[in-house]
């Protein structure tokens, strides 16, 4: 049994073998990536634990509204090549959730650092704006640029993983990746006991964490509400 972490790794493994069982962890779109036939019935030699959770978009908006009550528009920045599920899964949910929160949804699909800068500059020029950064290899690769632009333009931004916040991002809400790794051995054991990956459903995330960088909040002039402080899993001073 092979454990594969991230979409690029699993894609490479998938090219090498269609027989050795593979259990993936932290893959955004296993169906779109061609790793499994469906979430319920993977159908091949690959199964595992995805980070996709469409309902998280509503939580993002809730957190941003708590942080910025005068919120009027929110942009989502993502790259469709590194997260095919973005357009298919996250964006429709984002647009619907925006209606509930009565904010204008803006979808920014980016493919280069220049496009990141342009999209964020346009957003920063609009009052009452905030930004959601979707997961994906592209946004991870360019996280330093995104974080620095958010700080320069004073855009309240929520990120998908803690490491964005460890590197200076304002706050993150996302899948607890360590929890996925803790759950993976169960599938490995079941496969070693004779179960087939084809019959083991792809598992969704169960545990999420909110991390807030208080130093960044002070630098940007944001007062973090007590309700967010109380609900945070970690506070970075």
Q: PLM ranges: what are they?
A:
Residues 1-237:
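Short hydrophobic alpha-helices and adjacent helix-cap/hinge residues
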């Amino acid at each position: 049994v092979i454990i594969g972490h991230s979409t690029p790794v699993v894609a490479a493994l998938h090219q090498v073998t269609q027989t050795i069982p593979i259990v993936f962890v932290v893959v955004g779109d296993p169906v779109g990536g061609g790793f499994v036939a469906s979430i319920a019935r993977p159908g091949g030699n690959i199964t595992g634990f995805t980070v996709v959770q469409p309902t998280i978009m509503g939580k993002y908006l809730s957190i941003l509204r708590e942080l910025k009550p005068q919120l009027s528009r929110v942009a989502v920045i993502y790259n469709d090549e590194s997260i095919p599920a973005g357009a298919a899964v996250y964006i429709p949910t984002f647009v619907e959730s925006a209606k509930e929160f009565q904010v204008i949804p803006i979808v920014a699909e980016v493919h280069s650092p220049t496009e990141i800068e342009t999209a964020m500059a346009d957003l920063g020029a609009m009052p009452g704006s905030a930004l959601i950064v979707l997961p994906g290899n592209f946004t991870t690769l360019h996280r330093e640029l995104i974080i620095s632009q958010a700080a320069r333009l004073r855009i309240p931004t929520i990120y998908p993983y803690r490491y964005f916040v460890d590197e200076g991002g304002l706050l993150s809400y996302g899948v607890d990746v360590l929890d996925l790794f803790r759950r993976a051995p169960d599938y490995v054991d079941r496969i070693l006991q004779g179960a087939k990956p084809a019959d083991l459903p792809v598992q969704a995330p169960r545990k999420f964490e909110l991390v807030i960088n208080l130093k960044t909040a002070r630098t940007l002039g944001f007062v973090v509400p007590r309700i967010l402080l109380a609900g945070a899993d970690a506070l970075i001073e």
